Amino acid sequence: MSKIGNSGSESKNTLYCSFCGKSQHEVRKLIAGPTVFICDECVELCMDIIREENKSSGIKARDGVPTPQEIITVLDDYVIGQQHAKRVLSVAVHNHYKRLAHQSKSNDIELAKSNILLVGPTGCGKTYLAQTLARIIDVPFTMADATTLTEAGYVGEDVENIILKLLQAADYNVERAQRGIVYIDEVDKISRKADNPSITRDVSGEGVQQALLKIMEGTIASVPPQGGRKHPQQEFLQVNTTNILFICGGAFAGLERIISGRGEKTSIGFSATVKAPDERCVGEIFRDLEPEDLIKFGLIPEFIGRLPIVATLEDLDVNALVQILSQPKNALVKQYQRLFEMENVELAFHEDALRVIAKKAIERKTGARGLRSIMEKILLETMFELPTLEGVQKVVISSDVVDGKARPLYIYSERVEDKENVSA
């Protein structure tokens, strides 16, 4: 009976966290307040929530707009490398929203909008940069694929549908939508199909460029609230696109040859000078980009004129891809480690294994976009087996596993019975 009494008194003296309900024996530290207790785990969780809120909403400057330094600091947490592109984007976005914040204060000088063109190899982070920027500024964001767009009246998507998507992202709040960001991907695919204007209409190339001119510069777009094609009986929402920031991105495959060959005069005969091929990587060649190169590629001068800010992105090397795998907040390695944690298993990668994964992605010429498919292939069998295996504590991935020369190393935890046998 005395034992029961002692256990009852012990349970009364045990303190519990007022938030998660864990006892003082289950946590490292329990902090007492006037009437409540909070454990160290709940404190860490609260700090994580506050940090994420600060990151998602952005740290506002005095005039309500994040400074370029604050924007680039947040970008560094999510995007590896591309320092030049980050600087160009952070300054451009800061100036754009500073212009909107001071628009009503002075009427003497009207500041024009500066849309942005991102040029870089596939998988180098163009789309991700635009998405992260919208999250920092906390404005509605939508992404459109230029390959699906056609001129009005033809089968395909009208350019007005881009504004409709932005309106949907703003929960049909027109005022918020008019300050949003639109990212148009694969803009290189709407280049003119030939150097000279064709007799037949190019409805998915030059025609789309012509259709985009007005909404990029600023116009009142009539948007059908339900989407789809317009009809006379339908009511329209009027959206002013003057203050919407347009960011266009594309890989521009073959543009590097136009840049390298600019100004070259070809000659034949024994006196002809033989020029060595440009051995620079694509990202380095893109740094010398001029508007005339984009015109030769197939963009019309009026379209290029609507994109005064050009940010070129570099190729990702092995070191950059290894950093992308492991360092950002939502890095691929961390994502798969979280998946394995759900099975109470620790996932570990050797450093040389990450380098082999990065080299495979470079060989595929898919940049950072190809990393996930490589990781899936490596971990497929392990993720299939784990839910049915018992006692697995840790899975280790080496370079041989990535190359297909070995299986992942499974480390099992000691069973309770084994421990008792050893102690006996």
UniProtKB/Swiss-Prot annotation:
<dbReference type="InterPro" id="IPR003959">
    <property type="entry name" value="ATPase_AAA_core"/>
</dbReference>
<keyword id="KW-0067">ATP-binding</keyword>
<dbReference type="InterPro" id="IPR046425">
    <property type="entry name" value="ClpX_bact"/>
</dbReference>
<dbReference type="GO" id="GO:0005524">
    <property type="term" value="F:ATP binding"/>
</dbReference>
<feature type="binding site">
    <location>
        <begin position="121"/>
        <end position="128"/>
    </location>
    <ligand>
        <name>ATP</name>
    </ligand>
</feature>
<dbReference type="InterPro" id="IPR010603">
    <property type="entry name" value="Znf_CppX_C4"/>
</dbReference>
<comment type="function">
    <text>ATP-dependent specificity component of the Clp protease. It directs the protease to specific substrates. Can perform chaperone functions in the absence of ClpP.</text>
</comment>
<dbReference type="Pfam" id="PF07724">
    <property type="entry name" value="AAA_2"/>
</dbReference>
<dbReference type="GO" id="GO:0008270">
    <property type="term" value="F:zinc ion binding"/>
</dbReference>
<keyword id="KW-0143">Chaperone</keyword>
<dbReference type="GO" id="GO:0046983">
    <property type="term" value="F:protein dimerization activity"/>
</dbReference>
<dbReference type="Pfam" id="PF10431">
    <property type="entry name" value="ClpB_D2-small"/>
</dbReference>
<feature type="binding site">
    <location>
        <position position="42"/>
    </location>
    <ligand>
        <name>Zn(2+)</name>
    </ligand>
</feature>
<dbReference type="InterPro" id="IPR019489">
    <property type="entry name" value="Clp_ATPase_C"/>
</dbReference>
<dbReference type="GO" id="GO:0051603">
    <property type="term" value="P:proteolysis involved in protein catabolic process"/>
</dbReference>
<keyword id="KW-0479">Metal-binding</keyword>
<dbReference type="InterPro" id="IPR004487">
    <property type="entry name" value="Clp_protease_ATP-bd_su_ClpX"/>
</dbReference>
<keyword id="KW-0547">Nucleotide-binding</keyword>
<dbReference type="InterPro" id="IPR038366">
    <property type="entry name" value="Znf_CppX_C4_sf"/>
</dbReference>
<comment type="similarity">
    <text>Belongs to the ClpX chaperone family.</text>
</comment>
<dbReference type="GO" id="GO:0009376">
    <property type="term" value="C:HslUV protease complex"/>
</dbReference>
<dbReference type="InterPro" id="IPR050052">
    <property type="entry name" value="ATP-dep_Clp_protease_ClpX"/>
</dbReference>
<feature type="binding site">
    <location>
        <position position="20"/>
    </location>
    <ligand>
        <name>Zn(2+)</name>
    </ligand>
</feature>
<dbReference type="GO" id="GO:0016887">
    <property type="term" value="F:ATP hydrolysis activity"/>
</dbReference>
<dbReference type="GO" id="GO:0140662">
    <property type="term" value="F:ATP-dependent protein folding chaperone"/>
</dbReference>
<feature type="binding site">
    <location>
        <position position="17"/>
    </location>
    <ligand>
        <name>Zn(2+)</name>
    </ligand>
</feature>
<feature type="binding site">
    <location>
        <position position="39"/>
    </location>
    <ligand>
        <name>Zn(2+)</name>
    </ligand>
</feature>
<dbReference type="GO" id="GO:0051301">
    <property type="term" value="P:cell division"/>
</dbReference>
<keyword id="KW-0862">Zinc</keyword>
<comment type="subunit">
    <text>Component of the ClpX-ClpP complex. Forms a hexameric ring that, in the presence of ATP, binds to fourteen ClpP subunits assembled into a disk-like structure with a central cavity, resembling the structure of eukaryotic proteasomes.</text>
</comment>
<feature type="domain" description="ClpX-type ZB">
    <location>
        <begin position="5"/>
        <end position="58"/>
    </location>
</feature>
<protein>
    <recommendedName>
        <fullName>ATP-dependent Clp protease ATP-binding subunit ClpX</fullName>
    </recommendedName>
</protein>
<dbReference type="InterPro" id="IPR027417">
    <property type="entry name" value="P-loop_NTPase"/>
</dbReference>
<dbReference type="Pfam" id="PF06689">
    <property type="entry name" value="zf-C4_ClpX"/>
</dbReference>
<dbReference type="InterPro" id="IPR003593">
    <property type="entry name" value="AAA+_ATPase"/>
</dbReference>
<dbReference type="GO" id="GO:0051082">
    <property type="term" value="F:unfolded protein binding"/>
</dbReference>
